[in-house]
Every structure is written in C-alpha cells, then in structure tokens.
C-alpha cells in the first residue's frame, strides 16, 4: 500500500494513541475520498486485535459489508438488547380480552398488547464489544451524548471516523465535539476519478456543478424524465413540502392507496424512543396494514436488521397535519422521500437528490446529500 505523507502521519498518530491509550477514543476526520476507510481497514488488519466496525444505520452497515468489511454491526444492535416486558399489564389485558364482547374494544386491547409486547432496551451483557480490542465507528457526528456514554461504558478503545464537511447532526450536539484529532484534507488521485467523489468535492468547495453526465451519475433539470426518481433506492430533498409531495407521488407510483400505511410500506421514525428502540431517522417496513384507533394508529413494524416491533403512532404526519411534539405516541411518516438532514448517517446504492436547499449551510447540505450515494447519483435541479 502506497500512502501519502498525510495518510502516513495519520497512521502514526492512530498507532501512537492505541499503544498509549491515554484517552478512550481517537477521532479521525477527513473529506470524502481522502482515505479514512482505507486507513481504518489497514489498522484493523495490522493491529492484531479483534476489531468491530460499527455504523449508525443498517444501510450504512450494508455499504461497509459491500466494501469488504467482515465484522460490522449497527451501533444499536451492538450495545443494546431487548429487556423484560410489562408482564402484569399484559396479563390483565389478556384477561379482559377473554370476556370482551365489543369489537372496537377488542381492537384497542390487541394493539395495547402489541405495544406492551414490543421490546424495550438495556445495555447488552453479551455485547461483542466486551471481547473487542478496537471499535472502528463510522460517522461519529451521529452519536448522541447518551449513546456515546453507553459506548464508552464497555471500556473498548474507539477509533471514530467522521467528515466535518457534512451538516451538523440533526439532534444538536454530538458526543464527539471539537476538531478531530487528525484531519485528512488531500483527496487521493484515484478518488478524484470517482464521479460521486468529484461531485462531492465541487459541492464542498462551493463550486458550480454543471448539468451533464458523470460516469453513471448525472445532473439534470427538474421536470424531465421521472424514471431517475423511480429507479433510485432513496429520494432526498431539501424542504418538508417536497418530502410530502415526493412521498405522495411515489406511493401512488408503487400502487398504495389511502392516507395510512399498507403492508409493505417504507416508514421513517421522526422521534427518539430509546426505551423501545426507535431512533430518529431510522427506517422501518410495515408488516401489516395500519389499524386506525380512536386517537392513534397501530403499526406492526420491522427494521433493517429484521427486529420486529409494535407501535402506537400519532396520525398527524400521515394526514399532512402539524406534529404533536408533546404526544406520548411514537412518531413515524412515510420514508420514500427524506430530507437530507434526516438522511444523515445512512447511505444507499442509488440516490436521487432534489437540489433545492438555499438556506444555512448550503454547501454542507449539498455535500451531505451527494455523499449519501454509494454507487449512482442523480442530482435534479430547478434550473
């Protein structure tokens, strides 16, 4: 392996930190194409200790596996485990169900049972971190204060990778604050030939991105061929009104009808509920048609890693109404279109990006959206 002087210095600093262990984590920052992942892989292969790679979402973990990483997990799966259920409450509802004669009440009881039976979470006693010599954590900006503290509680040294060119995390302040311990700024010569890295570099530097073809990626005008959107794994947008319109249109293209989710639909979580394993920005699939109750929806869900859960969710997002920020119900919406802010920490093979954000952090917004694509990108602009 041939290293640039900057990469060689980064490797030296990582090894020095690991040997001295004067602090529990080391942050390695770098723009897209500067070799963060290459350095991390080399460290994992040559340190001679068991190493676990971790990503914030299942989609990002999948991309790491595609790149040849063998031992990879999501953060939540690695450190949290389902814990005991509300047994007494479940037994009381089951007893009521046996004698209940009113169909509406039976439906309510069944969804209360689903909700109580869903897993709640605690730190894993059998976490893979327990026997681990090193954790390599991708996208460290997405780690909240609580998750960061939980990670450190296992006592395993953490090499945290991140990209300061991206948007700040959507939830506020990350656990990993301040400048990275080492920052890579030199985009590798071979990476410059990658169309997505090239487009990302133009965006980060605030340069114009002309219309045209970039390998298998492209920049097109809005209002043309809609196949680019239909073929994408994920549509990313800048505005909530575009997200609403995109979700409506894509549901219609697929063949779903009605306001509320049918079986097999794609949802995104809009509010953290760590106690039961729901995290803001996490995507889920519906296993059954939603059940409409008096003041909420009953949802049967499965996440990217096959974990099943029941939810009692507020109806407002599915009806285009303002969210109730203070409700005890969980909050989901359709996930066919996501804002770039909500997409942070994840990645898809094929992305369609509606370039429409001209608010704060314009260059970071575009850079973040572009780097959500692993293989193929279509940027759709208004003019």
Residue ranges, per PLM feature:
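Conserved P-loop NTPase motor core of helicases/translocases
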Residues: 8-19, 29-31, 52-147, 186-187, ...
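C-terminal accessory regions
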Residues: 301-383
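Hydrophobic positions on the alpha1 helix immediately C-terminal to the Walker A/P-loop
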Residues: 39, 43
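Structural recognition of the conserved hydrophobic beta-strand(s) that form the central parallel beta-sheet
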Residues: 53, 136, 157-163, 379
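Conserved Walker B
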Residues: 137-143, 164-165, 343, 356-358
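A short helix->loop->beta-strand "cap" motif at the edges of active sites that frequently abuts
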Residues: 132-133, 154-158, 373-375
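Conserved helicase motor core of P-loop NTPases
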Residues: 8-36, 113, 146-156, 161-310, ...
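Dynamic helix-loop-helix/coil hinge segments at AAA+ ATPase domain boundaries and subdomain interfaces
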Residues: 1-9
């Amino acid at each position: 392996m041939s290293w640039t002087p900057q990469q060689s210095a980064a490797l030296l600093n990582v090894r020095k930190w690991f040997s001295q262990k004067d602090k529990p984590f080391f942050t390695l920052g770098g723009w897209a194409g500067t070799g963060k992942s290459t350095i991390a892989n080399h460290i994992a292969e040559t340190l001679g200790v068991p190493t676990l790679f971790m990503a914030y979402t299942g989609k990002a973990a999948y991309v790491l596996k595609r790149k040849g990483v063998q031992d990879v997990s999501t953060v939540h799966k690695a450190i949290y485990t389902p814990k005991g259920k509300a047994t007494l409450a479940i037994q009381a509802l089951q007893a009521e169900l046996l004698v209940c004669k009113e169909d509406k009440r039976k439906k309510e009881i069944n969804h209360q049972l689903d909700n109580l039976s869903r897993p709640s979470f605690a730190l894993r006693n059998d976490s893979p971190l327990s026997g681990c010599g090193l954790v390599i954590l991708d996208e460290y900006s997405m780690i909240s204060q609580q998750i960061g503290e939980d990670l450190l509680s296992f006592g395993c040294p953490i090499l945290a990778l991140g990209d300061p060119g991206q948007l700040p995390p959507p939830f506020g302040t990350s656990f990993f604050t301040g400048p990275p311990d080492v920052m890579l700024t030199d985009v590798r010569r071979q990476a410059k030939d990658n169309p997505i890295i090239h487009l990302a570099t133009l965006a980060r530097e605030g340069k114009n991105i002309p219309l045209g073809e970039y390998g298998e990626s492209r920049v097109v005008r809005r209002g043309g061929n809609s196949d680019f959107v239909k073929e994408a794994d994920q549509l990313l947008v800048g505005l909530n009104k575009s997200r609403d319109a995109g979700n409506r249109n894509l549901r219609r293209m697929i063949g779903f009808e009605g306001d509320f989710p049918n079986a097999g639909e794609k949802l995104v979580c809009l509010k953290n509920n760590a106690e039961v394993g729901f995290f803001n920005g996490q995507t889920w699939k519906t296993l059954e048609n939603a059940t409409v109750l008096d003041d909420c929806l009953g949802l049967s869900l499965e996440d990217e890693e096959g974990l099943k859960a029941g939810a009692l969710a507020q109806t407002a997002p599915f009806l285009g109404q303002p969210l109730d920020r203070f409700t005890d119900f969980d909050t989901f919406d359709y996930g066919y279109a996501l804002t770039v802010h909500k997409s942070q920490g994840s990645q898809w093979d094929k992305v369609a990006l509606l370039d429409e954000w001209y608010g704060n952090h314009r260059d970071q917004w575009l850079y973040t959206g572009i780097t959500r694509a692993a293989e193929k990108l279509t940027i759709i602009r208004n003019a």
